[in-house]
Swiss-Prot record:
Pfam families: IPPT. Belongs to the IPP transferase family. ATP binds at G11, P12, T13, A14, V15, G16, K17, T18. The record marks T102, R128 as: Interaction with substrate tRNA. It comes from the Bacteria. It catalyses: adenosine(37) in tRNA + dimethylallyl diphosphate = N(6)-dimethylallyladenosine(37) in tRNA + diphosphate. Catalyzes the transfer of a dimethylallyl group onto the adenine at position 37 in tRNAs that read codons beginning with uridine, leading to the formation of N6-(dimethylallyl)adenosine (i(6)A). One of its GO terms (biological process) is tRNA modification. Gene3D superfamilies: P-loop containing nucleotide triphosphate hydrolases. The lineage of its organism: Bacteria, Bacillati, Bacillota, Bacilli, Lactobacillales. The keyword tRNA processing applies. HAMAP family: IPP_trans (MF_00185). Its cofactor is Mg(2+). This is tRNA dimethylallyltransferase.
Amino acid sequence: MRKIKLIAVVGPTAVGKTALGIELAKTFNGEIISGDSQQVYQKLDIGTAKASKEEQEQAYHHLIDVREVNENYSVYDFVKEAKVAIDTIISKGKIPIIVGGTGLYLQSLFEGYHLGGEVNQETLKAYREKLESLSDEDLFEKLTEQSIVIPQVNRRRAIRALELAKFGNDLQNSESPYDVLLIGLNDDRQVLYDRINRRVDLMIDNGLLDEAKWLYDNYPSVQASRGIGYKELFPYFSKQIPLEEAVDKLKQNTRRFAKRQLTWFRNRMNVEFIMVGEENYQQKIKRKVSDFLSSK
């Protein structure tokens, strides 16, 4: 069966994924699927760096504002709903363009996971990270202990097999129905960190404090409140730290998050990054997309 072609724009926060995704959607008749675990929440617009109303008018966005703030959202939900969105976009004769930085969600979708029951996102993530920390010798020893045989011995297949063994029918693996063009965006580290710092300042100017205070007053313990952009401000609202310290912590956590995102995409999804500082980088990406879509 012919695989469905997907374009995926990935990379660290603040690198410019949203703008590129919209440009590709306009150029190649596409619609965007958000691959971000926080942008699903209604009323949380600033802290999640959600595409603005003006940006959403330029290209239709799926999986934005699909949950109330007090609802949970998991990798199970994302895979299920992203597949529906992909089918919807394809039925219109358009190209699905997935834009986001939540690596676990994207990897689970692209690598053929389908879920027979709900797997707790944090449980899956913790188990995968535990396996990733093992040496090759220890990892393959675990395969032997559980009598797991895989046709080709490499770390990715080994980890996938152990996940399937642990979670059973809740996390099944089959051949992916998708042919994915992964476009990884990156920038010089200091340039990226400076952009992150400026974006946090802009978020504060645009009303992040009011948005976070509303969450603090109404839903301080829900899953959404644990996201970067909100949890750092809660100690300020409870008068434990001054605002300047809270904002500095938010910038620091965002920079660290960007570093973790890069590590995930490099090590777990084999993404080759394009530097946004390169001359004509968007034109290079468009040529790559055009070649991908025209190939059989």
